[in-house]
Amino acid sequence: MAIDAQKLVVVIVIVVVPLLFKFIIGPKTKPVLDPKRNDFQSFPLVEKTILTHNTSMYKFGLPHADDVLGLPIGQHIVIKANINGKDITRSYTPTSLDGDTKGNFELLVKSYPTGNVSKMIGELKIGDSIQIKGPRGNYHYERNCRSHLGMIAGGTGIAPMYQIMKAIAMDPHDTTKVSLVFGNVHEEDILLKKELEALVAMKPSQFKIVYYLDSPDREDWTGGVGYITKDVIKEHLPAATMDNVQILICGPPAMVASVRRSTVDLGFRRSKPLSKMEDQVFVF
């Protein structure tokens, strides 16, 4: 009988206790997105914050409060909209990270009057849903994968840069340096400026940001003026000859084409039409 009692105790410890513990804490949350899935999932808009006359931050809810989106740092999602009976898709990079956001994800979207998906998102009301799938993309940032990142962003192209910078800022073991040149038309167009400055304050020895405006609205503007040219890149970003550096580019097509040419003129290896993680110049 004593032996049977001992066996019963062992069974309780090995089998019953873990099951009870699992029941109490609930199942481990899994990422909502699955790269192996090719179907779209729906997520409701739960909050909208207007940033400028045509740009807002949209927060979409996940199924459960402890869910994470499941998006590797630097990758994007695909959003589908049905426009006049035709399915249209566009790619967007969330500004939120799995490491600091649960139960929702955030998108920075500039809505254009003649746009398709961006216009649809701009017209969403609280409770309306979007359809997304992912993650997608060839860039996946990992701690200290580069010694120095040079970033060139225009408009909402700041989204992937902000995401990567936030990941570096939150990681006490990440020593990657970041130099960002952020171009916009007017000062009011500078998106996430307070958030970016907060990241610089977290790691001032690693982060440097220079703002460029096409048309400054005040005479005492202390940032750069004009387009992001070869000379601007040479002055503010790491040189091609430096060890383990990479240039990241995201923004309007005309700006991207121009700065890509400039990087080649400055000695960087010519970027491929479809960028790869190992490229010296990567275009999102």
Curated annotation (Swiss-Prot):
Signal peptide: none annotated. FAD binds at residues 122-137, 148-180. Its EC number is 1.6.2.2. PROSITE patterns: FAD_FR. Optimum pH is 5.6. Active from pH 5 to 7.5. Disruption phenotype: Simultaneous disruption of MCR1 results in resistance to diphtheria toxin and zymocin. Pathway: Protein modification; peptidyl-diphthamide biosynthesis. It is found in: Mitochondrion outer membrane. It catalyses: 2 Fe(III)-[cytochrome b5] + NADH = 2 Fe(II)-[cytochrome b5] + NAD(+) + H(+); 2 Fe(3+)-[Dph3] + NADH = 2 Fe(2+)-[Dph3] + NAD(+) + H(+). Monomer. Component of the 2-(3-amino-3-carboxypropyl)histidine synthase complex composed of DPH1, DPH2, KTI11/DPH3 and a NADH-dependent reductase, predominantly CBR1. Interacts with KTI11/DPH3. Interacts with STE20. NADH-dependent reductase for KTI11/DPH3 and cytochrome b5. Required for the first step of diphthamide biosynthesis, a post-translational modification of histidine which occurs in elongation factor 2. DPH1 and DPH2 transfer a 3-amino-3-carboxypropyl (ACP) group from S-adenosyl-L-methionine (SAM) to a histidine residue, the reaction is assisted by a reduction system comprising KTI11/DPH3 and a NADH-dependent reductase, predominantly CBR1. This is NADH-cytochrome b5 reductase 1. It comes from Saccharomyces cerevisiae (strain ATCC 204508 / S288c). The lineage of its organism: Eukaryota, Fungi, Dikarya, Ascomycota, Saccharomycotina.
